[in-house]
Structure formats: structure tokens, C-alpha cells
Amino acid sequence: SLLHGTSSVNETGGGLGGAVKLSTRPAQNDGFGLQYIQGVGSFKTFDEFLRLTYGNEHWQTSTRAVYSSSPNEFEYRNHDKKVNVYDEDMNIIDQYYPIEKNKSGSFKDLHLLQEVYYNTGRGDRFGLNGWYINSNRELPMLTVDHGEDTDFENRQREQTFRGVISWDHLDDGWKMGAKGGYIYTWMAYDYKRDVGNGNMAHMTQSRSEINTIYGQADGEYYIGKKWLFTANLSAHQHFVESRDKNIIRQDGNKAVVGYKQARIELSGSVSAKWRPSDRFGVSAVIREELCGTEWTPVIPALFLDGVISKKGNVIAKASVSRNYRFPTLNDLYFLPGGNPDLKKESGWTYDAGISFSVGREGVYTLSGSANWFDSYVKDWIIWLPTTKGFFSPDNIKDVHAYGIELQGDLSVALAPEWSLKMDGNFSWTPS
């Protein structure tokens, strides 16, 4: 799910522009199930999806496999370059934008996700999840690269495993849960270039390994139908080793240069939600985080929502939050390009919006929304290209990002088994 702006504070800190939450839930199937989907796209892009499920009163299992691949090679007119046309006296008489080919954008991604859930039938559910990723991607050169059209390889490979064990308990008026997990990531970045006669020389040979152990506990407690209180606490212990195996010493021999670092991260929050009527609600969140040995100031957030009209289900929402984001270990120590001198980001985010939904059952549904957001961020971290041929993160002193977003969805039933769906989005986001 996509958490816009302030709403990310409910889940985690650091989401100055929002956050993306990845989660799954039991399939709730009886017996065996099989699903297969194939997608075909431009530039010989293929997507394969296979899912096998089994479920009964107590057990739910799901096995999913996804494979995506594409050479992603296409021609385009490069408007970031201009080629000069000369006369016999080497005077510029014309200029044009060249037609170039994207030759380094292929990818092959494999995802395997295994889930097993057991429901005791007495309010407790236990889960075991494993997710494996194998990714092999080429990285295109910059569109402003004026180097000669020689052979090169600019490739990033990744293997990641995420394992989670979970417990959830649901009772009248309250619920709680706990999770524990382990994440392992191996990442390789190789940049080679033809130095002549077909000999490919390594310019960069980066290897990174990340091990993370984490735990999380959360709870919810209801008082009647008007009050909801929540609490959440999570801890992550990261261990990262990043090295470049292609550093040349002054004596001409290769050396391995890199970093080996560890960091603890804690995050805790409490919230209160009050709904005095079915047409109005307000909630407040307070979060605080520890990164290494540094605490953030208190991170507050306030949310308001109200039903303007039940006819058309017209709802207005508004929120405000303060937030902080520490540079990740990848920002600080990734080789090549990491910047150990980065400062943490901080900022305020405001947003407001209105939405509606109308329709007739079995005939059509129409919904839409309009949102405004305004964000002020200090020391924004952004990865930028360098003259050394790779990207590196740096702090931009002050950033003001604002804009509007419009969205509309229409679904029309053409027949009992057929429907036509249309959606549109518009955004205006200067900064």
C-alpha cells in the first residue's frame, strides 16, 4: 500500500515524502488453488506469475513465483545532447539531436515467496514467510555521456532473502502481535569498458553484504466505539560490509578497500484516535527513533477527516507532521559513491484533500479525489552523478516540494461477466 506524506508516520519514521508498505495476508482458500498470469509488453518485456495455494480450517499456505525479463533496447531521440554540423572550414552551420539506442537497460528478476499460516481457532494465528529475490540488471549510461561508442558493461546484481515469523492475537476490544525476522542481501556492481582490442577492463568491482536482524511488537485497544489507542515498537540491527575490489595502489597492485559497519535502529510510537460521530474523526501520533547513538526529537503528526456529504460519499481530509530521516548505511558506506559525511534530513509536511464516490450497483461506479501537499525539507539526501563515473549522495540545503494530484476511476458493467474500467491521474509537482 502507498502511504502519502504524513500518513507514513503511523508506520515508520523517515518517510518525508511518504512510504511504500509491502505486506501479505492469508489467502483464505478452501482446498487447492492454482493461478497463472502472463504479461507481454513493449521492447520484448515478459512477466510470468504462478501461484499455488492450499487451505483448510486451520492451515493456509501460498507459494508464489514471479519472473520478469526484457532486453529493454530501443531507439530514442536524445534531447540532452546536440551534435554540431560543420562546413569545410569547420564552422558550425547546424545542430541536431541525435537518435541513439538504449543499449544497457536489460533486466532479469526472479521472486519466490512462500507463506504458511496456522490459525488455532481461539484468536491466535502464527505465520512463517520467506521471500527470495534474484535480480540481474544493466544500468544505462547517462544521456549526457559524450564518450565514444565503445563496448561497456554497467551491471548490478542482487540476491536477497527475507524470513519472518509472526504471531497475532485478536480478542474483544484489543489485539496484539509480534514479529521477528532476518534479512540477507548480497549486491554486486561491475563497470567494465573496452580499453582496446576487445579487452574489457574493470573500472569498478563493488561487493556489498548486509545482514539485518529485527523484531517488532504492536498492540491496539478500543474503548467503546469512539476511542482507539495503538502502540508500536521495532528494533533493527544492521551489519554491512561494502568493498571495491578494483582499487589500484601506487605500486600498480590491486587492493581491496571498503567499510565494515554495524548500527542499531529503534523506533517507537503511540497514537490516539477519536471519532465522536460517524462524520468526524481526529487522531494524533507521537514517534521517536534511535539511530546508532543519536535520538531524533519527538516526531508528531495530526490527522483530521470529516464527511461533508453522505450523498456522494464526499470526504475531506487534512494532516500535518514533522519528520526526520537518517542516512542509510548504503548512503554512508556503499562503494563506490558512499558519503560518510551526510547529515540527517528533517522537515514538515502538510496536505489536504477531498474525495467522492458514486454509482449504481451492477451498473457503474465513479470515484475521484483531489489532493494538495506542501513539504519543506532541510538537508535533503539525493544521489547525483559525479565526474568519476558513478553516483554519490549529498545533502541539498533546503527543498520546498509542493503540488496537487487528481485521480479518477470509472467502472461500467457491460454484461454480467464483462466490465469496462478507466482511470486517469494528473499531478503538478514543482519543487
Residue ranges and their predicted role:
Residues 155-160, 182, 190, 194-283:
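Outer-membrane beta-barrel transmembrane domain signature of Gram-negative proteins
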Residues 74, 103-109, 122-176, 184-211:
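Flexible loop and strand-edge segments within Gram-negative outer membrane beta-barrel domains
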Residues 58-61, 123-126, 173-176, 226-229, ...:
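Repeated loop/turn-to-beta-strand initiation elements of outer-membrane beta-barrel proteins
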Residues 1-3, 10, 14-39, 48-50:
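N-terminal periplasmic accessory domains that precede
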Residues 35-37, 47, 97-102, 145-155, ...:
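Extracellular loop and loop/strand-boundary signature of outer-membrane beta-barrel proteins
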Residues 275-281, 367, 371-376, 395-431:
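Gram-negative outer-membrane beta-barrel transporters
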Residues 136, 186-188, 292-298, 306-351, ...:
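Surface-exposed extracellular loop regions of Gram-negative outer-membrane beta-barrel proteins
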Residues 42-69, 81-136, 159-173, 221-229, ...:
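Transmembrane beta-barrel wall of Gram-negative outer-membrane proteins
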